């Protein structure tokens, strides 16, 4: 398999340098401003976080109010993803199809994973794997999960298998936790921008709301970085929710953060947990990217590494293989909580969100193979992630586009505000549609409830030829020259320099 070589990464010869940026921004901005003004009266569809589910409407008479809300999410929030799957790029069958730089998946290590999952020790069928199991998961798997998390989270004491529940993915974990922790209409605090699908996870079953903790790109006051979360901002958001009559039951934290890539320090984690204890709030900590920190200078620490949790009965940690092991299709996620009432309630919902016995066996085999993980998979995965991140970063710098440079996750938070003349979400949506029309799917800031229009998430964890082609199509849109770029590679070439016109 071709590994993205860092030394081969160069800015494309077709990139517009800094001297061109003023003209590029000006001509495109005037065009976008005119198009936006023509469409303002048409009321573009809006992607909302569920501040108030009652705002969602649908005309169908066949569905319950809950069903109408679920259908609304499918019709609106999934538009780009559905469009992509109807016109998916294939270098042989559909070279002018859509390049997906919007979905956060790791597509860099299929060769390593396919080899490991096809080994003989993965192939086992016995009666116990074909029958109903403990809804928390087979004991052999929960034991391996506890050992795995103890090692990689650097827990000061061994984690216990009785505190582990396994489900079919992180989405199910969010849904189950929200349902068992909150009454309908209650809320979780969540810093924004945040992984927008959490809105669906907590709302579609449990009708749980999200109370936003808005973060700013400007560094002000005591902040030391853009979009910094502080206890003061948490307190303010909590007061605002209470003033609106919303009961807040918990706080959702993501570390490494999606879409920012930020990693919370142990001191920050402790401050957030103390805040939550003070207000008797549950804390859901999503650490699904914990093994995808590819810069050695980034000092990642799991919440489970803390010597003492301020409120262990209200602290619930999530992890899954979908990101760190590039297995979003296998649907494996795990919850670690010391609260046995919560664990039992979530386990009961595993009747609807459980894993097959065969998948549980494979996951146990994978997680116990510490030699392969440490000596083969993680070093190579980190090297490929770093190389891909370097390439996209250099492309953005060549275009004079600001972005947050972090060393974790699969994405870069990109600032395209200068391409929005009036700085509106309508313009952001129009720019997103231009990207999609030019066959490149990105994620726009409103989908993450970013308060400032013009931010986009670029996913870089993909093969080099798709990254090159996707960035070429992005450049065409920003230059006001939208046209579908096809893969110009010779059939045997894999070098970035040979993939550009």
From Swiss-Prot:
One of its GO terms (biological process) is biosynthetic process. It holds the Pfam family Aminotran_1_2. Residues 480-501 are annotated as: Disordered. Residues 490-501 have a biased composition (Polar residues). It comes from the Eukaryota. InterPro entries: Aminotransferase_I/II_large, Ethylene_sulfur-biosynth, PyrdxlP-dep_Trfase, PyrdxlP-dep_Trfase_major, PyrdxlP-dep_Trfase_small. Substrate binds at residue 105. The modification N6-(pyridoxal phosphate)lysine is found at residue 323. Disulfide bonds: none annotated. Signal peptide: none annotated. GO terms for molecular function: identical protein binding; pyridoxal phosphate binding; transaminase activity. Changing residue 393 to L: In a breast cancer sample; somatic mutation. Changing residue 221 to E: In a breast cancer sample; somatic mutation. Coiled coil: none annotated. Keywords: Pyridoxal phosphate. Transmembrane segments: none annotated. Belongs to the class-I pyridoxal-phosphate-dependent aminotransferase family. Does not catalyze the synthesis of 1-aminocyclopropane-1-carboxylate but is capable of catalyzing the deamination of L-vinylglycine. This is 1-aminocyclopropane-1-carboxylate synthase-like protein 1.
């Amino acid at each position: 398999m071709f590994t993205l070589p860092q030394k081969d990464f160069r800015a494309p010869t077709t990139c517009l340098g800094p001297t061109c940026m003023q003209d590029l921004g000006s001509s495109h901005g005037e065009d976008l401003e005119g198009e936006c003004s023509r469409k303002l009266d048409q009321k573009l569809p809006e992607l909302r976080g569920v501040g108030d589910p009652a705002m969602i409407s649908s005309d169908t008479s066949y569905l319950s109010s809950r069903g109408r809300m679920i259908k609304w999410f499918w019709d609106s929030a999934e538009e780009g993803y559905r469009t992509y799957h109807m016109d998916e790029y294939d270098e042989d069958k559909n070279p002018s199809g859509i390049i997906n730089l919007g979905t956060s998946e790791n597509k860099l290590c299929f060769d390593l994973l396919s080899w490991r999952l096809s080994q003989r020790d993965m192939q086992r069928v016995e009666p116990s794997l074909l029958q109903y199991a403990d809804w928390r998961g087979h004991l052999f798997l929960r034991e391996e999960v506890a050992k795995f998390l103890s090692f990689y989270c650097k827990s000061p004491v061994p984690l216990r298998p009785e505190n582990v529940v396994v489900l079919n993915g992180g989405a199910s974990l969010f849904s189950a936790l929200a349902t068992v922790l909150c009454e309908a209409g209650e809320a979780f605090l969540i810093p924004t921008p945040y992984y927008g699908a959490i809105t669906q996870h907590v709302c579609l079953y449990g009708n749980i709301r999200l109370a936003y903790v808005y973060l700013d790109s400007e560094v002000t006051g005591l902040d030391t970085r853009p979009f910094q979360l502080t206890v003061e901002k948490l307190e303010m958001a909590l007061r605002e929710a209470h003033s609106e009559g919303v009961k807040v039951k918990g706080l959702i934290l993501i570390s490494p953060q999606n879409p920012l890539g930020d990693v919370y320090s142990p001191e920050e984690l402790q401050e957030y947990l103390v805040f939550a204890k003070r207000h008797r709030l549950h804390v859901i900590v999503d650490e699904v990217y914990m093994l995808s920190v590819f810069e050695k200078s980034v000092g990642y620490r799991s919440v489970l590494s803390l010597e003492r949790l301020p409120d262990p009965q209200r602290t619930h940690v999530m992890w899954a293989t979908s990101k760190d092991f590039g297995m979003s299709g296998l649907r494996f996620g795990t919850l670690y909580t010391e609260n046995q009432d919560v664990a039992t309630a979530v386990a009961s919902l595993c009747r609807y969100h459980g894993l097959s016995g065969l998948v549980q066996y494979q996951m146990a085999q994978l997680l116990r193979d510490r030699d392969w993980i440490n000596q083969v998979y993680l070093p190579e995965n980190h090297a490929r992630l770093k190389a891909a991140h370097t390439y996209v970063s250099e492309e953005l710098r060549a275009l004079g586009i600001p972005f947050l440079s972090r060393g974790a996750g699969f994405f870069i938070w990109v600032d395209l505000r200068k391409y929005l003349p009036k700085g509106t979400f309508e313009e952001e949506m129009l720019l997103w549609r231009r990207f999609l029309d030019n066959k490149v799917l990105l994620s726009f800031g409103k989908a993450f409830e970013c308060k400032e229009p013009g931010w986009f998430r670029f996913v870089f964890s993909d093969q080099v030829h798709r990254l090159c082609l996707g960035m070429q199509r992005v450049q065409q849109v920003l230059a006001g020259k939208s046209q579908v770029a096809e893969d110009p590679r010779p059939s045997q070439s894999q070098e970035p320099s040979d993939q550009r016109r």
